[in-house]
Amino acid sequence: MSMGLEIAGTSLAVLGWLSTIVCCALPMWRVTAFIGSSIITAQITWEGLWMNCVVQSTGQMQCKVYDSLLALPQDLQAARALIVVSILLAAFGLLVALVGAQCTNCVQDDTAKAKITIVAGVLFLLAALLTLVPVSWSANTIIRDFYNPLVPDAQKREMGAGLYVGWAAAALQLLGGALLCCSCPPRDKKYAPTKIVYSAPRSAGPGTSTAYDRKDYV
């Protein structure tokens, strides 16, 4: 695997990891839907994983942290846990990628480096899935409630910027992890057998005495 491809994969995965952190902190997973009687509402409600915010028409914003985890919908409760695990898993994957990077000397063997890089890629892929699942689940819940006639218009929400950031983060981590998984261990070098050249013994000259004289055989 070339160093350029490895750097590209690691960079994309790091961007996805940072985007996941932004997605986790952004209080804009759900936004007030302006339909029906809510069109004349002079405030906008944002709902995130950790707090909800109310933005007045004057531009004043007030945010409040959730008092209890049970106050959250089921999809946001699961999203909290999965997104946090995704961030921690991607952070561990980044450390593994640095250990197996070609520009570091933590590991000397090229084959071991390639295997470590593949492990880092798998960790980033798992982190991407842990981000993609809660984001898609929350988006599905929002769309389902939006078109449900039994849900009052005041309780209907639209998809916020946090969901789009989450999808972008998952895509970056998937692409970066896939590039890191392309790191193949180097093949064993095959050496050609050494040819041994035998030289013929020199024949003794006519006047040269040999180790054994002919008279010894008589």
From Swiss-Prot:
Its main location: other. The modification Phosphoserine is found at residues 199, 209. The chain crosses the membrane at residues 9-29, 81-101, 116-136, 160-180. It is found in: Cell junction, Tight junction; Cell membrane. Residues 217-218 are annotated as: Interactions with TJP1, TJP2 and TJP3. Residues 1-8, 102-115, 181-218 are cytoplasmic. It comes from the Eukaryota. Residues 30-80, 137-159 are extracellular. Keywords: Cell junction, Cell membrane, Membrane, Phosphoprotein, Tight junction, Transmembrane, Transmembrane helix. InterPro entries: Claudin (IPR006187), Claudin3 (IPR003549), Claudin_CS (IPR017974), PMP22/EMP/MP20/Claudin (IPR004031). GO terms for biological process: actin cytoskeleton organization; bicellular tight junction assembly; calcium-independent cell-cell adhesion via plasma membrane cell-adhesion molecules; cell adhesion; cell-cell junction maintenance; epithelial cell morphogenesis; establishment of endothelial blood-brain barrier; negative regulation of cell migration. It is a multi-pass membrane protein. The keyword DNA damage does not apply. One of its GO terms (molecular function) is identical protein binding. The keyword Membrane applies. One of its GO terms (cellular component) is plasma membrane. The modification Phosphotyrosine is found at residue 198. PANTHER family: CLAUDIN (PTHR12002). Belongs to the claudin family. Plays a major role in tight junction-specific obliteration of the intercellular space, through calcium-independent cell-adhesion activity. Can form homo- and heteropolymers with other CLDN. Homopolymers interact with CLDN1 and CLDN2 homopolymers. Interacts in cis (within the same plasma membrane) with CLDN19. Directly interacts with TJP1/ZO-1, TJP2/ZO-2 and TJP3/ZO-3. This is Claudin-3. The lineage of its organism: Eukaryota, Metazoa, Chordata, Craniata, Vertebrata.
